[in-house]
Design a protein with these regions (language model features):
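Extracellular calcium-associated, cysteine-rich motifs in secreted modular proteins
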Residues: 200-302, 307-309, 313, 318-359, ...
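Peripheral membrane lipid-binding modules
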Residues: 69-152
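C2/C2-like lipid-binding beta-sandwich modules
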Residues: 33-80
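Bacterial Sec-dependent signal peptides at the C-terminal "C-region" and cleavage site
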Residues: 22-41, 342, 346-357
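C2-type phospholipid-binding modules
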Residues: 127-202, 456
């Protein structure tokens, strides 16, 4: 009888414990498990994934030194990537003869110990050599020197926080998840510099990307519920953006007034443009490109693809990351404008009103995007700023320039003109070189302002897709330092 009573008591005790567990909130149970265990995520077996998002060779002819920056002298690069996670090496396929890889579609995943917080990650960018010579390690590191350690990137990833530090970190000059080989000061030096975008994440039970440990120990959210889109502190920005960029999603911040990188975009606008790669701690330059439909005879008024790539390279290597909405984006605002053989100033204003603002003077793009339209021909000039945030270039006039001087490069002509007018929206108005007496070799200004090697100088506008750094004496100007990223909002 005593044995039966003892068994009955044990069963009742077990049942009560079961009920207690069943009614206890899931997040509270998980918090107890975390604090009493070395497992940083008891819901899953943790794997860490490094995803390569974009690669760009900074291959460009620089007027500043009359030399070409390149990765492979004989051809476009044959890029491939090596990723090392906790000493386990992964190698991507080779992307042959490609300077710009916008969708590599490659990642490396490694299972890691669930009870060790820090994971070592190395990223290397290589140019394959099919001639029998050794493959070349490209420079994507901020470190100086010529050793392999000064070219690859070494990171430490935390499975506790979901963030990493090392050669790339939150708030660094090139941006989080973006590597720039020119960060060592080698912009106008030949060091096989390149740009590489990447992300690191880990297995996450609820799929919101926020690690279990952060949800349970910092935010008090349920690690079994996807919290994407939630804004519990009601500051206008969701939890996943605030976590990613190091803000506290449980404490309201004045994101409408915060602009830590002073690029003119407040944090609400940085969040809205994050789908296109913006970073609240690194300067971004957004430009909407509208273009004109072909003429009845088939003449086009578009910005050449090669010009776009030159613009990306020129801005990106200076860590002013260029975002050109040319119609290829998801959520694009770019449009094709009906053909007009001769566009008056008043018609330019109408184009801006109808195709950029769309009649809405509170359009969210106003104050976020510059507006640069390619028309067939202006009635006044082949390129000009017609408002603080807007400008045009005329394809017909630029094609005539190419026809008159055949040795000029068409991509450079368009790229230089587009960058020149963008410069005015950045408040670059140089004293020298930007006048009617400096545009041709038979003019005195051409020779006097030769040290100012910038597309803002009429003597270089069609041969240079770059601004000057002011390093060539008294008759030079530092456009990069003098520009005002907020001027277009005036």
């Amino acid at each position: 009888m005593q044995t039966i009573r003892k068994k009955t008591m044990m069963l009742m005790t077990a049942f009560i414990l079961f009920l207690l567990v069943a009614v206890t909130p899931f997040s509270s149970v998980k918090a107890t498990l975390t604090r009493g265990s070395d497992d940083f995520d008891p819901l899953v077996d943790i794997s860490v994934t490094v995803t390569i998002d974009k690669i760009r060779a900074f291959d460009k002819f620089d007027q500043q030194l009359m030399k070409r920056e390149y990765v492979d002298w004989n051809s476009d690069p044959d890029f491939f990537v090596k990723v090392i996670i906790n000493d386990q090496e992964f190698t991507s396929p080779v992307w042959p003869n490609m300077k710009y890889i916008n969708d590599p579609n490659w990642s490396a995943t490694c299972n890691v110990p669930d009870d060790v917080e820090l994971v070592n990650v190395v990223i290397q960018l290589w140019d394959a050599n099919d001639t029998g010579a050794p493959d070349k390690l490209c420079d994507i590191s901020p470190d100086t020197g010529s050793t392999s350690d000064s070219k690859d990137v070494e990171l430490t990833y935390s499975i506790k926080t979901g963030h990493w530090t090392g050669d790339d970190a939150l708030g660094d000059p090139s941006g989080y998840g973006r590597l720039n080989g020119d960060d060592d000061g080698s912009i106008y030096q030949h060091q096989s510099d390149a740009e590489l975008w990447f992300t690191i994440n880990q297995t996450d039970y609820d799929g919101d990307g926020i690690p279990y440990w952060m949800e349970v120990n910092e935010y008090g959210t349920d690690p079994t519920v996807n919290n994407r889109g939630e804004d519990t502190d009601a500051d206008g920005v969701p939890i996943e953006w605030e976590w990613w960029w190091g803000y506290n999603p449980t404490v309201a911040e004045s994101h409408a007034t915060l602009d830590p990188d002073v690029d003119g975009l407040n944090n609400l606008e940085e969040y809205r443009t994050s789908q296109w790669g913006s970073d609240p701690f690194r300067a971004d330059l957004f430009v909407e490109l509208d273009q004109m439909m072909p003429s009845p005879t088939g003449e086009t008024s578009t910005l050449p693809e090669g010009s776009k790539e030159l613009l990306y390279t020129a801005y990106d290597r200076q860590n002013l990351v260029y975002h050109l909405d040319d119609g290829s984006w998801v959520g694009t605002g770019s449009e094709m404008i009906p053909f007009d053989s001769l566009t008056q100033d008043s018609e330019l204003d109408a184009i801006y009103e109808n195709y950029f603002l769309h009649g809405d003077h509170h359009n969210w793009r106003l104050g976020v995007f510059h507006y640069g339209v390619v028309i067939y021909q202006s009635a006044v000039v082949n390129g000009n700023m017609f408002g603080r945030n807007r400008f045009q270039i005329s394809s017909h006039g630029l094609e005539q320039k190419k026809a008159t001087i055949p040795f000029l490069n068409r991509d450079v002509i368009y790229g230089g003109a587009y960058m020149h007018e963008t410069g005015h929206t950045l408040a670059i108005f140089p004293i020298g070189g930007h006048n009617p007496n400096s545009g041709a070799p038979w003019q005195l200004g051409w020779w006097f302002w030769r040290p100012y090697k910038s597309c803002m100088n009429y003597g270089y506008i069609y041969t240079t897709v770059d601004y000057s750094d002011g390093s060539r004496g008294l008759r030079d100007f530092n456009d990069w330092a003098d520009m005002d990223l907020t001027a277009f909002q005036s």
